[in-house]
């Protein structure tokens, strides 16, 4: 049977205040409170990252919507928070209570996703780097719940985000899911004592580090003994169309008098000017689904960029998902990169989540969306 700590809400209005006096006289953010209750946890389904599913558990003390629940596990997980700097974290899963029924069964939202809920990200931020976006998200001055920083593997999140949006802002949830899917990583949350021995505070950190700084692919196989289930997941929702008829307004006539240009999405996802295609048609969709688009020229007289049209007719990215029981002889951790053999086929991806119940310990493997054979 598991145990849990229950806290009042970690409201940034209170905790994001720098009036806590350190032994050296420096002022820091207020630390987290002591738990208001300690209880046992039964009838539970607890997801470690919660990127896809909501958790639930029955607690042996009364809880309210808005409370924070820290589930404690008799287990440690390894991380490498900097190159050559390894440590072990006690496995805890931190949630926001979003609903409670009459039997005191609580619906639990993973802390990270609850923290950024309702936050929007300006396009100016989405056009920068993955690090800049994450830094924007993990900021208690603007989001729903308190955090005190994060363990961050810069090698995993290196690079520039490629998030094409029409609106001036995008929901933080959508932006985060897109980045995490691209880099094959999901954040977790941990409550622990401050890193400095002279700092008496307990703090909450978001973990963006894996068990190895330089992740190496682990090859394994799963079979029927691990109760495997298979389905698919749409990791990027795009368009139901695969062919575009594009009219661009003539500046002289102020109307769409010029002949249209046609663009097509090939089976491999590339979008091309159809007039330049010289193939035999076998690499094009079996059924053409056309969409007519109308554009003005920009302030410099230029027509829309190909990237703009690509958003309108690129297919959704759909990948395979495998859910299976943990193998105690080769335990896998969330965010491990894995090549899995299942029923004679090799799937390449990562462990995106882990669910613990009273009866089993299961993993969610999600195939990489960058494979050439992905739908």
UniProtKB/Swiss-Prot annotation:
Its main location: virion. One of its GO terms (cellular component) is virus tail, baseplate. InterPro entries: Caud_bapl16_1st, Caud_bapl16_2nd, Caud_bapl16_3rd, Caud_bapl16_4th, Gp16_dom1_2, Gp16_domD4. It holds the Pfam family Caud_bapl16_4th. Signal peptide: none annotated. One of its GO terms (biological process) is symbiont genome ejection through host cell envelope, long flexible tail mechanism. Homotrimer. Belongs to the skunalikevirus baseplate protein gp16 family. Forms a dome thereby closing the central channel at the end of the baseplate. Changes its conformation upon activation by calcium allowing the channel to open at the bottom of the baseplate for DNA ejection. This is Baseplate protein gp16. It comes from Lactococcus phage SK1.
């Amino acid at each position: 049977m598991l145990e849990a700590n229950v806290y009042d809400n970690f409201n940034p209005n209170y905790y994001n205040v720098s009036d806590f006096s350190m032994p050296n006289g420096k002022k820091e953010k207020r630390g987290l409170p002591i738990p208001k209750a300690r209880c046992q946890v039964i009838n539970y389904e607890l997801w470690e990252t919660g990127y896809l599913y909501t958790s639930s558990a029955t607690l042996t003390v009364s809880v309210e919507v808005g409370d924070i629940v820290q589930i404690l596990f008799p287990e440690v997980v390894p991380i490498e928070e900097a190159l050559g700097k390894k440590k072990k974290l006690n496995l805890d899963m931190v949630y926001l209570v979003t609903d409670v029924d009459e039997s005191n069964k609580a619906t639990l939202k993973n802390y990270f996703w609850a923290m950024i809920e309702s936050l929007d990200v300006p396009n100016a931020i989405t056009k920068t780097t993955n690090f800049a976006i994450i830094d924007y998200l993990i900021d208690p001055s603007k989001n729903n719940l308190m955090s005190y920083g994060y363990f961050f593997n810069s090698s995993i999140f290196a690079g520039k985000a490629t998030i094409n949006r029409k609106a001036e802002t995008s929901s933080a949830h959508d932006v985060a899911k897109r980045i995490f899917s691209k880099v094959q990583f999901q954040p977790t949350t941990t409550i622990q004592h401050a890193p400095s021995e002279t700092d008496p505070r307990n703090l909450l950190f978001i973990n963006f580090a894996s068990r190895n700084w330089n992740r190496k692919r682990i090859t394994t196989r799963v079979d029927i003994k691990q109760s495997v289930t298979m389905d698919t997941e749409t990791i990027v929702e795009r368009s139901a169309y695969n062919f575009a008829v594009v009219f661009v307004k003539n500046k002289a006539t102020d109307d769409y008098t010029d002949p249209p240009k046609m663009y097509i999405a090939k089976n491999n996802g590339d979008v091309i000017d159809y007039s330049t295609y010289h193939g035999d048609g076998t690499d094009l969709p079996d059924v053409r689904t056309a969409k007519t688009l109308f554009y003005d020229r920009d302030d410099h007289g230029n027509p829309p960029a190909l990237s703009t049209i690509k958003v309108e007719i690129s297919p959704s990215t759909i990948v395979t998902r495998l859910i299976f029981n943990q193998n105690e002889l080769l335990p896998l951790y969330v965010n491990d990169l894995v090549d899995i053999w299942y029923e004679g086929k090799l799937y390449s991806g990562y462990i995106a989540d882990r669910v613990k119940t009273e009866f089993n310990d299961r993993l969610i493997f999600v195939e990489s969306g960058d494979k050439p054979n992905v739908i």
